[in-house]
Amino acid sequence: MIQRMISTLVALALAALPLSAAEDQKEADRLDNCGTVLKEILDIPDNIPTDLLDKAECVIVIPSVLKAAFVIGGSYGKGAMTCRSGEHFTGPWSAPAMMRLEGGGIGFQLGGQATDFVILVMNPRGAKAILKSKVKIGADAAAAAGPKGRDAAAASDVTMRAEMLTYSRSRGLFAGVSLEGSTLRQDNGANEKLYKGNLTAEQIVRKGAVAVPPSGQEMIAFLNKKSPKNLSDPNSLKE
């Protein structure tokens, strides 16, 4: 009887291994997709202005969000966040932490095709707020639809004071978009699968607890090449 129970438990454990591996690979594939989407967006002619990217402390990418995700049972998109390393956000881009974008009026902005979102976090206060737990966009952190191309020079004071600048790409069209009312939070389950440990987003992004995983290397290498230095006013980085 005991031998049979042991055999059953071993069989169940072995059966669970492929499922666990598949879940881990799903997070790796999602992170790899974040890098692909970010590179595609930053390579288009009329994209996020370079001077804004150079002043961003963090970049968040939420790829391939479908309207159904915000209507049927779930209401969230999944992606990744990376920040400039160092005490004052002046170093190379960090290992990425997995994030979730939830609720708000996002579903009403989505069509039938997948939509990609990119969020620039423009000051340390906004970055630290996200890394603590969660942020409601527009309430806990001021946000604005980001300007694109040459529009940066003519951006309004409201836009330039925003802690987050938000963008979307859908059906080949790229534009600033309002995400007010939505919530950003760290995806602890995804981070655990990706890094094989119970790590917070702050430990991953700010504490340097892990190296960049293979699936995140394209995203981080591209950012380090595209925007190697933080060109923000040094005084604004001492919060």
Model-identified regions with their sequence ranges:
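Hydrophobic h-region of N-terminal signal peptides that target proteins for export
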Residues: 11-20
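Small-residue-enriched, tightly packed secondary-structure blocks
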Residues: 22-239
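Bacterial N-terminal signal peptides that target proteins for export
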Residues: 1-9
